[in-house]
């Protein structure tokens, strides 16, 4: 993409009402534009990042055996009345009437819809287990939307729902999602701590939140320090095997959000030098809730003995749009965003310091073409701007590599490369520079 033709409306200063770093930088980098309180248009740069995060989530769900569906944003109120949650959800639910006076709602979550789909088609234990997931826009009418995409009213969410014959099978599904979530966050360059959590309006018997540490986080976290350094399970685990040891390894150490914190247990279970109290951002929430939805909604299957039984369910949510802000909160500096390579909107930028000068243009085009051929999704900064302005805007939006082409370097047969994450610069022949970026 040539920056002279791209739409990237950067700002020199963030609006005064942007309170946290991620909101400020997303506005300054031209990633989003607020259209109403808690509702944002996603501009090209922001959409590229959003789509990359969505794809990482999708790949890890598929790897763990979940199956993608797409459910509607508008849902029938009658389904929520059937589950008993229509009145319980309160003012956060946006209620709508169509022209026929039928009650609808803009879905804040999808347990009812997915259970309705399941009960229409699945009738036997032989068709279990099933785990269906959906990446869709949701709406919760927050009283005080704030912090940009971190706490908006409209948000993109991945929600998965597992259906199993009994509690033991449901716990296996829960463990698969537990491990898959840790793999998602690792691929996004995040260190996530799983903590026991309150089940809230979703309900259920077992729940974990996944929290990344950030000073601006809304949650307070009490945890054993070893959890911060514990790696993700990785892609090569046996998804059909017993994952309980992997889960236990990460849950036997104390970790709790403020709602579930027990100070006496914390002091007993974690040595003083291992106790960590910090603020964090919730980036995922998983639940096992047994028959909470299947029983009132009559979602049953015939068991091996022919007798019908209610299925056991779990629910697993990741805020995809929220993750954009969370990554920025965890990875930025004074100059702007520092994206992990996995979600950067562009893999590298070729910076032409003298557009219109034939020799410089030729080397810049050569570098741009080579990076395209290598699949690096390069950006060619061919704008007629001062070098300092070019460097500042590319640092702001977080492009991981800059390959800088200027007349002096071209005359000497070299270019300069800069690694955004470290600030390290090297002067190299073009072939060596391309090799370093594409390695």
UniProtKB/Swiss-Prot annotation:
Reactions accelerated catalytically: tRNA(Pro) + L-proline + ATP = L-prolyl-tRNA(Pro) + AMP + diphosphate
GO molecular function annotation: ATP binding; proline-tRNA ligase activity
Protein's cellular compartments: Cytoplasm
Principal location listed in the UniProt entry: cytoplasm
PROSITE patterns: AA_TRNA_LIGASE_II (PS50862)
Superkingdom field: Bacteria
GO CC, alphabetical: cytosol
Pfam families recorded: HGTP_anticodon, tRNA-synt_2b
GO biological process terms on file: prolyl-tRNA aminoacylation
UniProt keyword annotations, A-Z: Aminoacyl-tRNA synthetase, ATP-binding, Cytoplasm, Ligase, Nucleotide-binding, Protein biosynthesis
Enzyme Commission identifier(s): 6.1.1.15
Quaternary data: Homodimer.
Function: Catalyzes the attachment of proline to tRNA(Pro) in a two-step reaction: proline is first activated by ATP to form Pro-AMP and then transferred to the acceptor end of tRNA(Pro).
Family membership noted in the UniProt record: Belongs to the class-II aminoacyl-tRNA synthetase family. ProS type 2 subfamily.
Protein's name in the database: Proline--tRNA ligase
Organism annotation: Phenylobacterium zucineum (strain HLK1)
């Amino acid at each position: 993409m040539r920056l002279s033709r791209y739409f990237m409306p950067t700002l020199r200063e963030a609006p005064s009402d942007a309170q946290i770093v991620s909101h400020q930088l997303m506005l300054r980098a031209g990633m989003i534009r607020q259209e109403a309180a808690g509702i944002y248009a996603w501009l090209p740069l922001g959409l590229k990042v959003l789509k990359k995060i969505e794809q990482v989530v999708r790949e890890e769900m598929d790897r763990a055996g979940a199956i993608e569906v797409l459910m509607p944003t508008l849902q029938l109120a009658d389904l929520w009345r059937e589950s008993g949650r229509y009145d319980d959800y309160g003012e956060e639910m946006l209620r709508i009437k169509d022209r026929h006076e039928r009650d609808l709602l803009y879905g804040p979550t999808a347990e009812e819809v997915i259970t309705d789909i399941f009960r229409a088609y699945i009738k036997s234990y032989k068709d279990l287990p099933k785990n269906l997931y959906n990446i869709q826009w949701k709406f919760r009418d927050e009283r005080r939307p704030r912090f940009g995409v971190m706490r908006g009213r409209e948000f993109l969410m991945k929600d998965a729902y597992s259906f199993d014959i009994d509690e033991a099978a449901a716990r296996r599904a829960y463990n698969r999602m537990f491990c898959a979530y840790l793999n998602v966050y690792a691929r996004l360059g995040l260190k996530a701590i799983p903590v026991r959590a309150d089940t809230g309006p979703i309900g259920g018997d077992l729940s974990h939140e996944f929290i990344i540490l950030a000073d601006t986080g809304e949650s307070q976290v009490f945890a054993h320090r070893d959890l911060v350094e514990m790696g993700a399970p990785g892609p090569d685990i046996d998804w059909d095997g017993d994952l309980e040891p992997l889960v236990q390894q990460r849950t036997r150490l104390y970790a709790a959000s403020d709602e579930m914190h027990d100070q006496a247990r914390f002091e007993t279970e974690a040595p003083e030098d291992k106790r960590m109290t910090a603020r964090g951002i919730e980036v995922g929430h998983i639940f096992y809730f047994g028959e909470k939805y299947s029983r009132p909604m009559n979602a049953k299957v015939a068991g091996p003995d022919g007798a019908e039984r209610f299925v056991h369910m779990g629910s697993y949510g990741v805020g995809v749009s929220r993750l954009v802000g969370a990554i920025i909160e965890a990875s930025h500096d004074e100059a702007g965003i520092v994206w992990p390579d996995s979600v950067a909107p562009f893999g590298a930028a070729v910076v032409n310091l003298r557009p219109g000068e034939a020799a410089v243009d030729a080397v810049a085009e050569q570098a741009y073409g080579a990076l395209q051929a290598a699949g690096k999704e390069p950006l060619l900064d061919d704008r007629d701007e001062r070098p300092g302005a070019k460097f500042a805007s590319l640092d702001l939006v977080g492009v991981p590599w800059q390959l800088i082409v200027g007349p002096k370097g071209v005359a000497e047969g070299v270019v300069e490369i800069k690694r955004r994450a470290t600030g390290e610069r090297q002067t190299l022949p073009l072939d060596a520079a391309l090799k370093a970026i594409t390695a």
